Each structure stands twice: as C-alpha cells, then as structure tokens.
Amino acid sequence: MTEYLLLLVGTVLINNFVLVKFLGLCPFMGVSGKLETAIGMGLATTFVMTLASACSYLMEHYILIPLNIAYLRTLAFILVIAVVVQFTEMVIRKSSPTLYRLLGIFLPLITTNCAVLGVALLSINEHHNFIQSIIYGFGAATGFSLVLILFAAMRERLVAADVPTPFRGVSIAMITAGLMSLAFMGFTGLIKI
C-alpha cells in the first residue's frame, strides 16, 4: 500500500509530467487562459490518461508480447489513446454540451498530447504491474491537472495585473511557468525512491 502511495505522490508532485518531464506543454499553454476550461481539460485528460495507461498495459501484456510484435508498441498505444479519446469525447458531448463547446478543438487534441503517450510508454518501460500502471496514469494526470489549474488561475490574475508591456502575454506566462517549476522542485526531497 505504501508503495502505491509513494508512486502516486511521486508522479503528482515530484516527477510532474509538465514541470519536470516537459510533456504536455501544448495544452498547458493553450488551454490555461480560462480557469473553467482548464478544469474541464484537466478532468478529461485525467480520465483519458488513467484509462489509456490501463488499456496500454493490457495491450502490451496480452497482445503485443504474446504475438511477439512489441516493435509495434508506439503505434498500438496511439491507436488505444485515439479510441479512449473518442470514447471520452462522446461521453462529454452527451453529459456536458457546454464543456464540450468550451474545450472545442482541444478535446480531439488530447490524442496528440505527448503526455498521454508518455504515460503509457514510461509505465511499460518502468515495468509497472496493472495496478501500478493505473496509479501511475492517474498520478501523472492528477499532476498535469493540478499544474494546469494552478497555472490557469495565475494567468487569470495576470490579466488584471500591471505587467510591463514587454512582458505581457506569453512572456509573463513562461516566466510564471518557470517559477511554478521552481516551486515544485521543493518537493524533490519529499520522497527518497
């Protein structure tokens, strides 16, 4: 049980996919303009990453390895992720049309989010079992969502702030992201793995 908790805390805070591994930067910068959109994208990405991590484990251990076609891993995982994203898109369209409109083009772009593929590949490369794969996917997605929501809240406040003209827009956003990364570095000594 402790091992699972350490894996979860490690992926959320210490080895954050956005701030440490630099995966998922496109939606991090693109969807963080409004807090409401960031929350929706975070929830959708959390669902997709967790489910894709579990499905990728099953694909790897029950199809790719037994058939001796592990060299098709990346292609197979992209296919799994595309199916999971389409399923998520259908669920969001039916359950929350407003969120579906807010997310717009970013929902199908979860398919190309390198963080989702990164979770699947890294989970397999680190030889996680099925439960660890799910926890790793959920932890990575929770960390992604946490950073995305915090960053969106900061960007909303920066719009009203008196920022010097050369630093407005993307410049102050990148500085803020760098400061967030430094803040998350403080968690590095929290767990010794």
Swiss-Prot record:
Q: Which residues cross the membrane?
A: 5-25, 39-59, 63-83, 102-122, 134-154, 171-191
Q: Quaternary form?
A: The complex is composed of six subunits: RnfA, RnfB, RnfC, RnfD, RnfE and RnfG.
What family is it from?
A: Belongs to the NqrDE/RnfAE family.
User: Record's Gene Ontology CC terms?
Assistant: plasma membrane
> Where is coiled-coil annotated?
none
Q: What is the lineage of its organism?
A: Bacteria, Pseudomonadati, Pseudomonadota, Gammaproteobacteria, Aeromonadales
- GO biological process assignments: electron transport chain
PANTHER family in the record, alphabetically? INTEGRAL MEMBRANE PROTEIN OF SOXR-REDUCING COMPLEX (PTHR30335), ION-TRANSLOCATING OXIDOREDUCTASE COMPLEX SUBUNIT A (PTHR30335:SF0)
| Statement: the UniProt record of this protein carries the keyword Translocase | yes
Tell me the keywords, alphabetical order: Cell inner membrane, Cell membrane, Electron transport, Membrane, Translocase, Transmembrane, Transmembrane helix, Transport
Its protein name is Ion-translocating oxidoreductase complex subunit A
Q: Which InterPro entries does the UniProt record give?
A: Ion_transpt_RnfA/RsxA, NqrDE/RnfAE, NqrDE/RnfAE_oxidrdctase
Q: What class of enzyme is it?
A: translocase
User: What is known about what this protein does?
Assistant: Part of a membrane-bound complex that couples electron transfer with translocation of ions across the membrane.
Primary site of residence: membrane
Subcellular location per the Swiss-Prot or TrEMBL entry: Cell inner membrane
EC number annotated for this UniProt entry: 7.-.-.-
Membrane topology designation: Multi-pass membrane protein
| NCBIfam families the record matches | PRK05151.1, rnfA
